[in-house]
């Protein structure tokens, strides 16, 4: 999880984001009905954010794919001299630390942990790199200049940080419809190949016809997702000759509908629901995944009941509402609309979406703003450290230490230690150069002293020889000339040595005047670096020491394009809308799930009167319990027979994180209203995640503070008054005591303590990988009740953000997992209507569609 991680747009998006991303599926026993958390007292234990890097926070950028050449000269295994760092971060230094790791165009502190799909980045990058002269024509520049002359001068103000408001260029038409549906426009997916074997094995032209029908059908749906797209309407609007093969059009339409690519969410039905229901399904939990699955199954003609332990729906999508105050306690960010199914839902529901501005000034513990140069320098080093850990993992295969998987936190500390060692090595090398130069100078001076004595002696001899009055004989004349020659040679040699002396003294002076840094990071630099680490811990909802070094950002390549947005009227509007018309039993906590070859039985209790027990019989159970509830010991829900070892092992290996929020409702705005985010730099590494980021997202004067990393768990054991007091102390340090009033309302989330969540969202723990998400998604088939009996069919299914490998920890991931399981269950019990030639009869298990 860089997200996750990245184009020029991502660079702009950088400051924004990891804040409570999307929410996961329901809760143990169902979520509540009205996803709002109405005026609750401070201390409300409400849903946490679900989603790695929810939009809006400066989410740390995720590492790029591994490269062939080592970044920063990090060519030796851990323990060696380490990355070749150049100048290091020192107090007052304005030069970025040069670890040698290439800088990327990634955005800083963005809610997107992940980068946008590469194939749609080129246009955006080229536009972002244009100068103003290149971007505007000469006429436009002249017109602009004339217009500016007529305008009155603006009032003086601090120059704002540049914000890149451009959106990545996305394909349009049928190609764009495939893109928005997360499908390749020019080839069949492996799932389509399995469902349409006659097409994939046929001629190329047949596949092209299939792809056009598929893409055009998607386009028709996306053009108007408020109304059901029927087969008849599709056939009528398909252009000739693609509408000639009605059987193929019907199969494609059925396939897209069954798998939640069209006719999903909240839309007006053209065809009424079948009066006779086929098959009974119990869904545990009314979070987004459970609600999405229920609506689909209901539209397919199945009898569906949701069991929700809370008194509202929505699960970890929970909105606090009181008067004019609105604030999301759980998921609150839409991480880009390009390819996001929430883009469709946002057209169906009144979601008031607003872009999150990425500017995010940092304030130190003393309340002073971090200088921009220092901020950028440390952030650059943070990105380089991540690059170095990627190189350690993917190129040097440094993933196991002492027979234990290496965490991202461990690797970062290793790289930092290597950099510190490198600094010491540079110091040693520097002093060696000084000593060597001094030795050379000493040796030179000794030579010069000896030479001077020789010159003195020779000069005396020359003087004496010269005093012989002429006429001198040949011997005497030769002696004078030879002494003169020797004296000239020695003087020349002395001059050369004197010149060398000057150079050595200059070199020595330069060495002594320019010592290398004696530290890799000053204490101030480390505090700012810890802020970035806290932001990364926020994006993943867990301390870095628990994240898998190799796989923490395995979902990076599936990040959606576009700006991150917040739902200003509260994210709970989505689950409330999805819940309309469904049979939901609130305050009903599931205690036991029995599944056999012949059917299932779910035993639940009333949460307000646990003596009241309910038994529900059904053909299949869809479990959308959060991973935190599945991990709970002793188990909150008993499965009979117990879940197989492969499933429980995946549950144990995967991580379920924690992230909390403090909502502060004021009577007036005392912060910069143009800024959506500002950060608070902690004074210690241990407290780096404590109230490290403040959000200003809503119309009312509300600030939302985040608590991440180790601090998220510690804070759950502290009273609301202490937490709110700490928030106010930080704000007064930044804005001044007189500027900060007492809040009118406060709410503190405690997601780990929430019995129906037990945390915020999943992460890839050390020892886990993306494969575990696939294992979590696999249904369970009970063993045959009688030896030799026909092989039973799956009865127990799983959905939720922890079951979708490519989009974990997000609301859209939860939604997609619900659509996936609804298709799987319907294929199993109603038959796959898009297959040829055999059609399964209702009620009779049909050939199973491939895993989605």
UniProtKB/Swiss-Prot annotation:
Compartments in which it is found: Nucleus; Chromosome
Any GO MF annotation of the entry: transcription corepressor activity
PTM text: Acetylated by KAT8 in epithelial but not in mesenchymal cells, thereby regulating the epithelial-to-mesenchymal transition. Acetylation by KAT8 reduces KDM1A association with nucleosomes, thereby decreasing histone H3 demethylation, leading to transcription activatio of target genes.
Catalyzed reactions per annotation: N(6),N(6)-dimethyl-L-lysyl(4)-[histone H3] + 2 A + 2 H2O = L-lysyl(4)-[histone H3] + 2 formaldehyde + 2 AH2
Compositionally biased spans, kind Acidic residues: 160-172
Region (Demethylase activity): 300-852
Gene Ontology BP, a term: positive regulation of neural precursor cell proliferation
Inducing or repressing factors: Down-regulated during neural differentiation in neuroblastoma cancer.
Essential cofactor(s): FAD
Biased composition range(s): Basic and acidic residues: 138-151
Enzyme Commission designation: 1.14.99.66
GO cellular component: chromatin; chromosome, telomeric region; DNA repair complex; histone methyltransferase complex; nucleoplasm; nucleus; protein-containing complex; transcription regulator complex
Effect of residue 761 to A: Strongly reduces demethylase activity
Start and end residues of each SWIRM domain: 174-273
Residues where Phosphoserine is found: 126, 131, 137, 166, 611, 849
Catalytic class of the enzyme: oxidoreductase
The keyword Transcription regulation appears for this protein: yes
Family: Belongs to the flavin monoamine oxidase family.
Function: Histone demethylase that can demethylate both 'Lys-4' (H3K4me) and 'Lys-9' (H3K9me) of histone H3, thereby acting as a coactivator or a corepressor, depending on the context. Acts by oxidizing the substrate by FAD to generate the corresponding imine that is subsequently hydrolyzed. Acts as a corepressor by mediating demethylation of H3K4me, a specific tag for epigenetic transcriptional activation. Demethylates both mono- (H3K4me1) and di-methylated (H3K4me2) H3K4me. May play a role in the repression of neuronal genes.
Protein name: Lysine-specific histone demethylase 1A
């Amino acid at each position: 999880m860089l997200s996750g991680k990245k184009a020029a747009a991502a660079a702009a998006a950088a400051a924004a984001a990891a804040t409570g991303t999307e929410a996961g599926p329901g809760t143990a026993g169902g979520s509540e009905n009205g996803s709002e958390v109405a005026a609750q007292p401070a201390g409300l234990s409400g849903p946490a954010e679900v989603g790695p890097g929810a939009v809006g926070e400066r989410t740390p950028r995720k590492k790029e794919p591994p490269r062939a050449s080592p970044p920063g000269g990090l060519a030796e295994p851990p323990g060696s001299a380490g990355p070749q760092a150049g100048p290091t971060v020192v107090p007052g230094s304005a030069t970025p630390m040069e670890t040698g790791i290439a800088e990327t165009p990634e955005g800083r502190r963005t809610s997107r942990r992940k980068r946008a799909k590469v194939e749609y980045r080129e246009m955006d990058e080229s536009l972002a790199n244009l100068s103003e002269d290149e971007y505007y024509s000469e006429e436009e520049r002249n017109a602009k200049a004339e217009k500016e002359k007529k305008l009155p001068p603006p009032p003086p103000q601090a120059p704002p940080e540049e914000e890149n408001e451009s959106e990545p260029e996305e394909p349009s038409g049928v190609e764009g419809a495939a893109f928005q549906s997360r499908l390749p426009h020019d080839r069949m997916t492996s799932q389509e190949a399995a469902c349409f074997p006659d097409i994939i094995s046929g001629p190329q032209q047949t596949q092209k016809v299939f792809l056009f029908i598929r893409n055009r059908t998607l386009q028709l749906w996306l053009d108007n997702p408020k109304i059901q797209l029927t087969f008849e309407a599709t056939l009528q609007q398909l252009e000739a000759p693609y509408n000639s093969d009605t059987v193929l059009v019907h199969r494609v339409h059925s396939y897209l509908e069954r798998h939640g690519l069209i006719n999903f969410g909240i839309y007006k039905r053209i065809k009424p629901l079948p009066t006779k229901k086929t098959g009974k399904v119990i869904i545990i939990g009314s979070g987004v995944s459970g609600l999405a699955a229920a609506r689909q199954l209901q539209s397919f003609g199945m009898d569906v009941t949701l069991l929700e332990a809370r008194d509202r729906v929505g699960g970890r999508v929970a909105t606090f509402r009181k008067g004019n105050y609105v604030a999301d306690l759980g998921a609150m960010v839409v991480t880009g609309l390009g390819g996001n199914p929430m883009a469709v839902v946002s057209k169906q529901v009144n979601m008031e979406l607003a872009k999150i501005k990425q500017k995010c000034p940092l304030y130190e513990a003393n309340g002073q703003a971090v200088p921009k140069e220092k901020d950028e320098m440390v952030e650059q080093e943070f990105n380089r450290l991540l690059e170095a850990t990627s190189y350690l993992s993917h190129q040097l295969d440094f993933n196991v230490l002492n027979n234990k998987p290496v965490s991202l936190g461990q690797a970062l500390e290793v790289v930092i230690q290597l950099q510190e060692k490198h600094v010491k090595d540079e110091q040693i090398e520097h002093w060696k150069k000084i000593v060597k130069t001094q030795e050379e100078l000493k040796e030179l001076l000794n030579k010069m002293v000896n030479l001077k004595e020789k010159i003195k002696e020779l000069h005396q001899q020359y003087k004496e020889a010269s005093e012989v009055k002429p006429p001198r004989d040949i011997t005497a004349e030769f002696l004078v000339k030879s002494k003169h020659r020797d004296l000239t040679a020695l003087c020349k040699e002395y001059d050369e040595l004197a010149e060398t002396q000057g150079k050595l003294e200059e070199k020595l002076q330069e060495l002594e005047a320019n010592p290398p840094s004696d530290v890799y990071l000053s204490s101030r630099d480390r505090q700012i670096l810890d802020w970035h680490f806290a932001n990364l811990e926020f994006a993943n909802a867990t301390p870095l020491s628990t994240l898998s070094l190799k796989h923490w950002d395995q979902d990076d390549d599936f990040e959606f394009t576009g700006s991150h947005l917040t739902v200003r009227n509260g994210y709970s509007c989505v689950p409330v809308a999805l819940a309309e018309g469904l049979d939901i039993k609130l305050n009903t906590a599931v205690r036991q799930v029995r599944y056999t070859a012949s059917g299932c039985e779910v035993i639940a209790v009333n949460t307000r009167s646990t003596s009241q027990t309910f038994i529900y019989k059904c053909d299949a159970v869809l479990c959308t319990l959060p991973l935190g509830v599945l991990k709970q010991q002793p188990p909150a829900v008993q499965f009979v027979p117990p879940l197989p070892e492969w499933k429980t092992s995946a549950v144990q290996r995967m991580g379920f994180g924690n992230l909390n929020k403090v909502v502060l409702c004021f009577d007036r705005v005392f912060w910069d209203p143009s800024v959506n985010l500002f950060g608070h730099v902690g004074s210690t590494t241990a407290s780096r995640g404590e109230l490290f980021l403040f959000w200003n997202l809503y119309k009312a004067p509300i600030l939302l503070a985040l608590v991440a990393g180790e601090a998220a768990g510690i804070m759950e054991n502290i009273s609301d008054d202490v937490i709110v007091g700490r928030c106010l102390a930080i704000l007064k340090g930044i804005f001044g005591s007189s500027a900060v009033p007492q809040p009118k309302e406060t709410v503190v989330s405690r997601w780990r303590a929430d019995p129906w969540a037990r945390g915020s969202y999943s992460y890839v723990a050390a020892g886990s990988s993306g494969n575990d998400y696939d294992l979590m998604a696999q249904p369970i088939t009970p063993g045959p009740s009688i030896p030799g009996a026909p092989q039973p069919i799956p009865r127990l299914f799983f959905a939720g953000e922890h079951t979708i490998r490519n989009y974990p920890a997000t609301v859209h991931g939860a939604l997609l997992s619900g659509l996936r399981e609804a298709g799987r269950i319907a294929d199993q019990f109603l038959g796959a209507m898009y297959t040829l030639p055999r059609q399964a009869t209702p009620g009779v298990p049909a050939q199973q569609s491939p895993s989605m």
